[in-house]
Amino acid sequence: MEVDINGESRSTLTTLPFPGAEANSPGKAEAEKPRCSSTPCSPMRRTVSGYQILHMDSNYLVGFTTGEELLKLAQKCTGGEESKAEAMPSLRSKQLDAGLARSSRLYKTRSRYYQPYEIPAVNGRRRRRMPSSGDKCTKSLPYEPYKALHGPLPLCLLKGKRAHSKSLDYLNLDKMIKEPADTEVLQYQLQHLTLRGGRVFARNNT
């Protein structure tokens, strides 16, 4: 008899919370739906996505530090209470404007390192991005005027012989290769090019 009574009590205990949970779960889901689509979340997502698209249109690359700063701003704004968020919308917009201005300033100062057509490859050759139809003018720094005129230079100009180098002095080709690692790679390639044609050069040298 005790087992039956215990079994009945257990069955009632187990069956009672289930309908309660079923009744509570849709109420919770309905209560959570407006929270997910609440106003403080959506504009932050728009600004972050708009920031990335804005910078990818011009240079096709995004600085990760500025993205982290925007995410921190987003967490600060959404972490506060909704009443505070509704009370101070202008302050949040000022913070966002300041963050965007700061990120763009950082990007302008470091734009020399983010040039998409100067990516050193492993094998020594430089991969160069062809200018797309959307790129009407290439961004350039004032001390590098040849990039504004020509954009990414084709390989035929870079592989020109020494005899034609006088006519290409105005392009400042020596400024394009500033890193010592790149010059070492180019010297290595030149040595191997002469060794491939080796028999002729070996006869001349000996």
UniProtKB/Swiss-Prot annotation:
Q: Does the keyword Transport apply?
A: yes
Q: Which GO terms describe its biological process?
A: cilium assembly; inflammatory response; negative regulation of cytokine production involved in inflammatory response; negative regulation of fibroblast migration; negative regulation of inflammatory response; protein transport
Residues the record lists as N-acetylmethionine modifications: 1
Where in the cell?
Cytoplasm; Cell projection, Cilium
Tell me any Pfam family this protein matches.
Answer: UNC119_bdg
Q: Keywords, A to Z?
A: Acetylation, Cell projection, Cilium, Cilium biogenesis/degradation, Cytoplasm, Inflammatory response, Phosphoprotein, Protein transport, Transport
A single GO cellular-component term on record = cytoplasm
Q: What is its main location?
A: cytoplasm
Tell me where in this chain the PTM Phosphoserine is found: 25, 140, 167
Q: How does it assemble?
A: Interacts with UNC119 and UNC119B; interaction preferentially takes place when UNC119 and UNC119B are unliganded with myristoylated proteins.
| Record family assignment | Belongs to the UNC119-binding protein family.
- In Swiss-Prot or TrEMBL terms, this protein is called Macrophage immunometabolism regulator
Native organism is: Pongo abelii
